[in-house]
A protein has these predicted regions:
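Conserved acetyl-CoA-binding loop of GNAT-fold acetyltransferases
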Residues: 30-36, 88-89
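Conserved short beta-strand elements that form part of the metal-binding/catalytic scaffold
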Residues: 35-68, 73, 119-123
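N-terminal beta-strand motif that seeds the catalytic metal site of vicinal oxygen chelate
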Residues: 1-24, 69
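Short glycine-enriched loop/turn motifs at secondary-structure junctions
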Residues: 4-8, 61-66, 104
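Conserved active-site tyrosine of GNAT-family acetyltransferases
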Residues: 25-29, 114-117
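Vicinal oxygen chelate
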Residues: 17, 69-119
Length: 123
């Protein structure tokens, strides 16, 4: 019998390839608590606990506003406190935060649009 067990799905996030976009994205993700596990001039691997994604210096226009990520956390209120204390909307162009609330699909979550235009559901 075939073993079709999956291990995980890992996403690539395009940072954009204009001057400074990749570096800004690297700084942003580190600021919100992700650790770099590998890094080149065009690629970075970020982890936090059991979560992982790849950041790639690649044009983002084709995906900007169309990519969503779900980050499930142990304590949403602690994450919200941390995110708001960082004043991300003031420091980074395009970043938007929406306070935690219960959505019609029954999940309490906060929303974050990051510097790459990725829409994060944090729950």
């Amino acid at each position: 019998m075939a073993n079709l067990t999956t291990r995980k799905i890992v996403t690539f996030i395009p940072s954009g390839n204009q001057e400074g976009e990749f570096e800004t994205a690297v700084q942003f993700y580190q600021e919100i608590g992700f650790t770099i596990n590998a890094h080149t001039d065009e690629f970075a691997v970020f982890t936090k606990d059991e979560s992982k994604f790849f950041l790639q210096k690649y044009p983002k226009e084709w995906i900007q506003g169309n990519l969503m990520m779900v980050l499930e956390v142990e304590n949403l209120d602690d994450w919200w406190t941390m995110l708001t204390s960082l004043e991300l909307e003031r420091k980074y162009k395009g970043v938007k935060l929406t306070a935690p609330q219960i959505y019609p699909w029954g999940v309490r979550e906060a929303h974050l649009v990051d510097v790459c235009g990725v829409f994060w559901h944090i729950s």
